[in-house]
Amino acid sequence: MEKNLSSRDDDALHSLSASSSYDSVYDLLHYHERGNGLTINGKPSYSIEDAGEQITRDNVSWNGSNVFGKSANLTFKFLQSARSTPDGDTGFVKFNAAQVSQAKLALQSWADLANVTFTEVTGNQSANVTFGNYTRDSSGRLDYGTQAYAYLPGSGSASGTTWYNYNVDNIRSPDKMEYGRETLTHEIGHALGLNHPGDYNAGEGNPSYNDVSYAEDTRQFSIMSYWSEKNTGGDFNGHYAAAPMLDDIAAIQRLYGANMTTRTGDSVYGFNSNTDRDFYTATSSSKALIFSVWDAGGNDTFDLSGYSNNQRINLNEGSLSDVGGLKGNVSIAHGVTIENAIGGSGNDLLIGNGADNVLRGGAGLDPRFSDRCR
């Protein structure tokens, strides 16, 4: 447990007994402990590393089979025509402007994490990753079933292709925090070599969270999962992640290595963000955040000052935080140090990580705990 206690003001300390303060800190520090032989929801709990291996269990990337930590320079393409998908679906529709824009943001979110670059090609040029829509199933009927699918890397003609059901509203009009953007990021994950965390697929039987291989197979930990974050105690209030989550970061870095050029300066996440990433940027108190941070260096800050909710903010790597009225919606990847945090106008709990933390509670009664805190 963190040893030294300091506070924004004495009132915060007087308002909470020492016992209740430390109980609150203990609860947050041990918020969804995982791995180490634990069982959660009757399922084995996997560490972040074990989950990353599970999500990449086919051990394939654009570098071949059983090649790990090697960079890849990839191409992508928005198809202009197709007779049918590899599954036989028909009624091709090319990506519209909104889909193109959101797909490029989704590609960027993967490239930030690992040593993967994406270059767009057009015309008759072949590409590693392709995008297209379909509207009808193999029998020619309008398809309202499977919403999207993709193929892992390989040498076949289907490899790296991603397909989307244009009959679905939020597939046609994807946006941050909604299902359409999440779907783009998910399918690109497949095209890069990531599996679902468990052996299930849409349209094959009736799988549920009861069938998962390990407890953390939820959207709280992986954008590749089908299952609600509520199964592991999170609550995104109906929103979806736009970018890879905690276990996805471990997975993609296992295949291609960690991108150590990403945000090496002093980065701000949340309000007043300078990351140039929509999913790391809070624009108003009514807009939610859902993200896992990958950051390669600098003196970095979580600025959550615009929220009035009571927040629990933990700066330790691998941790979960409750931000902006959601639960377990912000996490920090292994190997990442976030030095500073700014709370909002609610009663926030802030926990540092042993770096030279600056923890500012804002308004409200805000106990702060860190090994070294200013």
Each PLM stretch: what is its role?
Residues 29-71, 98-220, 226-235, 284-288, ...:
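Metzincin-family zinc-dependent endopeptidase catalytic domain
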Residues 110, 293, 302, 313, ...:
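Hydrophobic "rung" positions of tandem beta-strand repeat architectures
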Residues 236-288, 296-301, 306-312, 326:
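Extracytoplasmic and endomembrane cell-envelope/extracellular-matrix remodeling and assembly machinery
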